[in-house]
Amino acid sequence: MAGAKEIRSKIASVQNTQKITKAMEMVAASKMRKTQERMAASRPYAETMRSVIGHLALGNLEYKHPYLEEREVKRVGYLVVSTDRGLCGGLNINLFKKLLADMKEWSDKGVEVDLALVGSKAVSFFASVGGNVVGQVTGMGDDPQLSDLIGPVNIMLQAYDEGRLDKLYVVANKFINTMAQEPKILQVLPLPPGDDEELKEKSWDYLYEPDPKTLLDTLLRRYIESQVYQSVVENLASEQAARMVAMKAATDNGGNLIKELQLVYNKARQASITQELTEIVSGAAAV
C-alpha cells in the first residue's frame, strides 16, 4: 500500500485537475449559450433559403441552372466541418466515422473523393489517414464569419462549375440539444428537391427580375453559403455542449476518485498508527 504522504499528494493533484475541469465546464456552458443565440438567429434564414430552393428545384424554370441538374457521378466533394480544439468527447471521431463510411460507399463504386476541411481536428485526422485534401481553413475561433469560409467554399464551387465535381456535401454535427449532437451529411449540390409534401403537391412558376440567370446565380450561391455557415455555427454549438458534458463528467469522476483515495489514505493512516502503537507496546513490554 502506498504511503500516506504519497496518497495525499495524489489527492491534491486530482483536486487541482478537478478545479481546471470545473472551470472549463463553466466556460463551455457560457460559450454554448452565446453560440445557441447565434445559431437561432441564423437558422430561420438558412431554413427559408432551403425552402425557396426546394420550390425552385421542383418548379418549371425558364432557365435550368447547372446546380439543379443531376449528372453522372465520377467525383464527389465533402466540405468537412470539425473543431479546432479537443476535450469535447467523441464529437469529432463520430463525425469522421460517418464520413469514412460514406466515402467508402463512393469508393466501392469507383468514384473519386475530394475534401475541403474546416477545423484543425479534421486537418490532423486526414493528414493521418490520408485523403485528397484540396483546401482547408483553421483557427476561426468562437465567432466564425462567412468571410473565413469563402476559401474552401470557392474551391469546391469552382471545381463543380468546371465539371471536376459531380456532387458536393457538407459534413457537420447538428445540434439537437445539450446532451445530443448528431453527425449529418447534407447534399448541397446538385440541389436536392424539397422533401416537404406541400412543395410536391403544388406546381411553382416564377417571374424573374431582372432575368432568371442573374437571379439564380446569385440566389443559389447565397443558398450554399448559408448552408455552410449554418453547419459551422451548429457544429460550434455542438462542440461547446459536448465539451461542457465531457468536463462535467471529468469533474464528477475526479470527485469519485478523491473519495476512493481518501479511503485509501485513511486505511494507510490507520495502519501507520496501529503499527506505531504496536511498537510502543512492544517496547514497554521489553522494559
UniProtKB/Swiss-Prot annotation:
Record's keyword terms, sorted: ATP synthesis, Cell inner membrane, Cell membrane, CF(1), Hydrogen ion transport, Ion transport, Membrane, Transport
Molecular function per GO: ATP binding; proton-transporting ATP synthase activity, rotational mechanism
Subcellular location: Cell inner membrane
UniProt topology in membrane: Peripheral membrane protein
Gene Ontology CC entries for this record: plasma membrane; proton-transporting ATP synthase complex
UniProt family annotation: Belongs to the ATPase gamma chain family.
Quaternary data: F-type ATPases have 2 components, CF(1) - the catalytic core - and CF(0) - the membrane proton channel. CF(1) has five subunits: alpha(3), beta(3), gamma(1), delta(1), epsilon(1). CF(0) has three main subunits: a, b and c.
Stated role: Produces ATP from ADP in the presence of a proton gradient across the membrane. The gamma chain is believed to be important in regulating ATPase activity and the flow of protons through the CF(0) complex.
NCBIfam families (UniProt xref): ATPsyn_F1gamma, PRK05621.1-1
This protein's name: ATP synthase gamma chain
Record lineage: Bacteria, Pseudomonadati, Pseudomonadota, Gammaproteobacteria, Enterobacterales
